């Protein structure tokens, strides 16, 4: 029932429509009718009554709150913070609140700041109303409420109206038999239990907690070493220096000067797809970053492959359909992780980090600028800084080209520039035909990168080519892959991995400044760490570089295994800190906090590296 009752004026009903969201409220239609009654009562009280030639009453109900607050402040009317009055008597300078109650004998004033004008459903008024209202006003109100009560009785809405005016309206909720059956269908226990009151006090059963004497070791997986599975290359990334110019001029120079020959072909990336790269290089050199399809693109981007698999599965399927299951192969820690950590923190010639300087307003801003400048000096010329810049440009350009041309091939060159303006060509990402709808949908990619060293065990899915440019030999890797939209967006902000090492560096420097009562930005103290099962020392600068390399590898290898590992390792790290402080750590009986961590060590090489680092540290503290 949503129609207007006959006893309510159409103008009042229309005005009430926008006052509240009646549809979502319990007994929303009845609540709307009751509020219309209160507004009508305000109008009947105010009806043509004057005082000194002006209206005696001001109706505040359903007016804009800011207007009410302005009028009340002007007339010095006090009211509760969230409960504005409904009516104001200019003759008596008194504010009123109009109330409807089910029983006048049980009514008590809601506030001492302004007066209540209370009426019941029969139209009877509280005794105090006779002192402030005229007989004609009371008679009009009684006649209106009698018509309202007649509508309530005829529509059998007495209970709903009483609950609404008493503020006790409750949503009636029940679970139907059909829904109850659906809930219980796949369970062995009642989803909706039957509450029972036991006559006796329930027995409390519990087992003693056990003290953790030593920290548990994590399992190190056995199996083949994990290969490089990140989107782009890491420490093996290299670039070709090109003459200064635009991206088109740099690609044109590369295309005209290069000679390509296959060295190693992988099963997942046939050598024939090199034609896709050369076609895109030629098209880009001619000023067309987007080109039409060629025959080799069908293999490189898996065009129509999904439809072929569906048709093949449908034609050969028999029996009941089941969800596909994919076994996750367990892999061990590869040796290249440690090699990446060493190579990524090696020195380079150029500075790869350029940040816009912030304005200095206070002395703290000046200290912060000095810390940032020193931090950039420490990490700006490392290999990892150059690789971060490469990933940033590649992911940003590829992400920006999603949805621009779904049916053709888009070339996204990875080009940086040195301070002298020379172009540095790292490679190219080819974005294939795609129809990405959700953030988790994958887009097909063909990635070509200049690499420094090829290892088949590390890059089994890469095909490697010899690239000769102006008599110089380079290695060119080619990989067919796909990547989701949300990960491309994440990697377009990969410069954020610089934040955590900067925070660690500033914390050490400022702690030394607090101890010595003076700031020294050149401080480079020795840091004691447990590495490879022994306590070793390294300088602060070396430590910050190592943290940056680890942050970068954790970022590019972030997946559910990494997130679960880090989340569950917090408990073990808290236990270690407590034991180092000579505090006792207790566990529930039979608890094994390392089990949840071990579940996350599967085939992520960086997770395996972190697990090995945990095992190399002491597990007993006395």
UniProtKB/Swiss-Prot annotation:
Keywords: Host nucleus, Virion. Gene3D superfamilies: Influenza RNA-dependent RNA polymerase subunit PA, endonuclease domain. One of its GO terms (cellular component) is virion component. Its main location: virion. One of its GO terms (molecular function) is RNA binding. GO terms for biological process: viral RNA genome replication. InterPro entries: PA/PA-X (IPR001009), PA/PA-X_sf (IPR038372). It is found in: Virion; Host nucleus. It comes from the Viruses. subunit of the RNA-dependent RNA polymerase which is responsible for replication and transcription of virus RNA segments. The transcription of viral mRNAs occurs by a unique mechanism called cap-snatching. 5' methylated caps of cellular mRNAs are cleaved after 10-13 nucleotides by PA. In turn, these short capped RNAs are used as primers by PB1 for transcription of viral mRNAs. During virus replication, PB1 initiates RNA synthesis and copy vRNA into complementary RNA (cRNA) which in turn serves as a template for the production of more vRNAs. Belongs to the influenza viruses PA family. RNA polymerase is composed of three subunits: PA, PB1 and PB2. This is Polymerase acidic protein. It comes from Thogoto virus (isolate SiAr 126).
